[in-house]
Amino acid sequence: MSLSTKLCCGLLTAVFLAAVSRGADDSPAASEYGPSPVLAPPEKSLIPTLHVAKAKPWEGDAMPHAARGTRVSVVARGLRHPRWLYVLPNGDILVAESDTPPKPDDARGIRGKVQKLVQKHAGSGTQPSANQITLLRDRDGRGEQVERHVFLSGLNSPIGMVLVGDTFYVANTDAIVKVRYKTGDTQIREEPIRFIALPGGPINHHWTKSLVASPDGKKLYVGVGSNSNAGENGIDAEKERNAVWEIDIASGSHRVFANGLRNPVGLAWQPESGALWVSVNERDELGDHLPPDYMTAIREGAFYGFPYSYYGQHVDDRMKPQNPAMVEKAIAPDYALGAHTASLGLCWSGNSKLPAPFRSGMFVGQHGSWNRRTRSGYKVVFVAFDHGQPRGLPIEVLGGFLNDKGDAQGRPVGLAIDKQGSLLVADDVGNTVWRVSADPNQ
């Protein structure tokens, strides 16, 4: 090993250790949440704040804590980085087992190497992606008789899944593929057909691609994240990214439905208003309390700021050159979910049979922070809706993902409502699918 390499490695280690050992700050404030958040002033530093919860999966009988009136149980353990969930009409549960794909041009230099160390510390990228969808068939509805089948394999970092008629669509990191499905199938043996290409490439900074169908089954909507933290790779690298695509199923044509959304991940329809809601993971390195992640009803043709501004028209001067005309167009989102919470999973309560106050609203899977001194997220929350709009502050549904030492025993991501009306939670550090149901004893 050369002297320069040794010096670089030593500097890298020092930066990482200094960053992850920073002291505590005030806890996340209520002002970071809700329809009218109070935004803190931006803070910048040479070394970004890194306070990463070390991945240490659940041991023994340990499990998350469910809210009063509910209980948590195991649907399946021993999965390989389960990220996303989809429930078929017959009640079968599909789990996308997926992790970061190779991205040779992403996160280069010392900063990039630190980011990769952070990801591994947090439990991502420690092994090749499983690249498969697993089917869970819960025969008794209690998780005591669960069959497990490899439903579809040979994929490429899959996340989004949706069934339209007898066609099953999967959003890989670089394309949507489709296969035929028959009710009751436990394994798809035919080779998936490529339906439409998605932005991938050697940077592919935000690699997950989420997917939902329109209620009439004529359109697909795809969440495509940005190719950077805050535009540092140039605006050309963001072409058709930081956006929700609309795809016409019949023709295969697509358009950008809404953009300026840094990393739109969860997608869910709000039936009362008919609006498509999205959960958005916002940018880093502007301070512990800025900017908040959010969920919003996306409007056709709307622009939400990225990379020029955040939370409406708050200018991010790191983006050069700036574009005042685009900033002027930027609209503020509907509901703040807290800074650096990594609010990824999104699920409408639908036919949920959980007790009040978890009846009419959105469930949000908060994967957890790495870029603030006091950790935020690492929980599933519920936001009540009234007349199609979110009201009040989030309510914790499932917590306890951090142990007493601050290690991450699990990290919640994808969410779904099962056929029994319980909430399913994918935990990609605990390698478990959890079920939150009403507690009959309360």
Describe the residue ranges of each PLM region:
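Bacterial N-terminal signal peptides
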Residues: 8-18
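Beta-propeller domain segments
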Residues: 25-67, 102-130, 206-208, 226-232, ...
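Surface loop/turn motifs at the tips and blade-to-blade linkers of beta-strand repeat domains
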Residues: 76-78, 149-155, 195-203, 256-260, ...
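Short loop/turn segments immediately following the C-termini of beta-strands
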Residues: 90, 98-100, 173-175, 181, ...
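Conserved beta-propeller blade signature
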Residues: 92-94, 167-170, 219-223, 275-279, ...
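Asp-box/WD-like beta-propeller blade repeats and closely related beta-sheet repeat scaffolds
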Residues: 144-167, 172-214
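Blade-level signature of beta-propeller repeat domains, shared across WD40, Kelch, NHL, RCC1
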Residues: 416-442
